[in-house]
Every structure is written in structure tokens, then in C-alpha cells.
Regions:
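Short Fe-S-cluster ligation motifs
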Residues: 162-174
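Short acidic-hydrophobic, aromatic-tinged amphipathic segments that line or gate anion-handling sites
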Residues: 171, 237-238
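Short, internal strand/loop/helix patches
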Residues: 173-197, 201-202
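Catalytic His-Asp charge-relay segment
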Residues: 224-226
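Structural signal for short hydrophobic segments within the conserved structured cores
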Residues: 233-235
Length: 253
């Protein structure tokens, strides 16, 4: 499973970047910015240093300006007990805003609801109609969904077989997409779902946008599952989870 921190850095932090660009950074920090880093904020640091959070080459990076303001040190800072003093500031200034942006992008994507709209927990997954592991996760999630505790949102794509996109289009085009998805998944290998012969332009645009988002996140397979942990942090699971991970993703039964 890819590192979530790596995943989060794949999307542009447009708002934070715009705000950061308005700052007049010290000369050494400007030099790092000139090399392609985005300076996203400043934080307190020990020993007379001043910390700066940056995004560089799809990674969060900590910068430390020396007390005289003439030099900058790049990298994580550790105390005498081996505690990483850079992790928390990077989480707050870099990774947390990126996680929020990813969640917002998934909210705006085209998905099929699976479960109660008032369910307290929402889980997104990129799903292909021909994906056996998507079907496995659908089955795994039934106790939570039927109890009204979880709403799955299936971001439909077409990557596994030649007819995958046409089948996703058929689900989107159904009079009741939620019911059509339930019928398809409940049938498993016996599904009678037929792909559309011709995909309407509006549905094709939805599928294209979903695929673009999947590519932005550098996801290679389905299901790619996104959920929030007990602290509200964004987490990802690639593939159908092991049974012992279900509670982390779906919450208590």
C-alpha cells in the first residue's frame, strides 16, 4: 500500500500556495523557493531556529532558518530523546490541508451512493464493475451498511476489462443507480449487468473525470478505499482489506 503522505503530496495546495506566495520570506528561504519548493508556512523551532514547512518534489519538507538569518538547513530535526520535531508541523501545515483537498475532490466526483444518507461514517472507494476485490469489500461492508452505520460512495471507473467503462456507464444511466449497483454486486460472478453500446457524452465526462482523479492520486488498482480515522485523519486502503482492518475502516459494528 502506498504511503498516504506520498499520496497526499500529489495534489496541488492551491489556496495555501497562494497565501504563502504573499509572504516576504527571508533570503535563504527564497533561494529554496526558487529551486521549486512551495513554502506553506512558518513554525516554532528550538535553539534559535525558525521552522518553515515546504512542499518539494511531491514531499513535505522542513526547513530551518538559522538565528542570524543567513543560512537554512533542510531536513527533519530530532531532539536528544530521538523525537522527530518536524513531523507535527508538517502534518499541520502540509499534509492536513492536502488531505482536506483530496476529500473535497472525492465529494465532487461522480459516485453511486450505497447506504443510508444519514450514516455517521462515509467511505469512498474507486470501483470497477469487473473488480472481484471491489465485490469482496462490498460483501464485507454489508453488516455496517445494513445497520445504517456506513455509507459507501462508489467512484465508478473502467480499468480492468474492455467493457468496464461501458458497465460503469450502465450503472450511472440506470433509473436507480443505487439499486442497480446493489443488484450487480449481490449477484457476484452471476451478475447480468450489460455495458452500454454507446456511452452518452455526459456520462463519459463523469467517467473521464473519475479516471483523471484516480490518476492524480497515482492509484493503479481497485478498490482504492479512503476513510477517516478516529482522529479525523485521512487514511487509504488499497485492495480488499483483511478482516482485522474492517473496524478501522468501517468503525465498530
Amino acid at each position: 500500500m502506498p504511503s498516504l503522505r506520498h499520496l497526499l503530496t500529489l495534489l496541488p495546495l492551491t489556496l495555501a500556495a497562494a497565501l504563502a506566495q504573499a509572504e516576504d520570506w527571508p533570503a535563504p528561504i527564497k533561494q529554496i523557493e526558487a529551486k521549486g519548493a512551495r513554502i506553506l508556512g512558518k513554525f516554532d523551532a528550538p535553539s534559535g531556529l525558525t521552522g518553515y514547512a515546504a512542499q518539494y518534489q511531491n514531499r513535505g519538507m522542513a526547513l530551518y532558518l538559522t538565528a542570524d538569518g543567513n543560512s537554512v538547513i533542510a531536513g527533519n530535526l530530532y531532539d536528544a530523546q530521538g523525537n522527530d520535531l518536524s513531523s507535527a508541523p508538517l502534518d499541520k501545515l502540509v499534509y492536513a490541508p492536502m488531505a482536506k483537498e483530496i476529500w473535497a475532490k472525492m465529494e465532487k466526483s461522480s459516485w453511486i451512493q450505497d447506504g443510508d444518507t444519514n450514516a455517521p461514517r462515509i467511505v469512498y472507494l474507486f470501483s470497477d464493475p469487473n473488480c472481484p476485490y471491489c465485490n469482496m469489500f462490498w460483501e464485507q461492508a454489508r453488516p455496517w451498511v445494513k445497520a445504517g452505520k456506513v455509507q459507501l460512495r462508489h467512484i465508478m471507473v473502467g480499468i480492468i476489462r474492455e467493457d468496464s467503462a461501458a458497465k460503469s456507464a450502465a450503472l450511472f444511466a440506470a433509473k436507480d443507480p443505487q439499486k442497480a449497483l446493489e443488484t450487480h454486486e449481490a449477484a457476484g460472478k452471476g451478475s447480468k449487468l450489460q455495458g452500454l453500446d454507446k456511452i452518452p457524452a455526459d456520462i463519459e465526462a463523469k467517467l473521464d473525470a473519475n479516471m483523471k482523479l484516480m490518476e492524480e492520486l497515482e492509484l493503479r488498482a481497485t478498490p482504492a478505499i479512503f476513510y477517516r480515522d478516529d482522529k479525523g485523519g485521512l487514511q487509504q486502503q488499497q485492495g480488499a482489506p483483511a478482516p482485522d482492518k474492517l473496524v478501522k475502516i468501517l468503525g465498530p459494528k
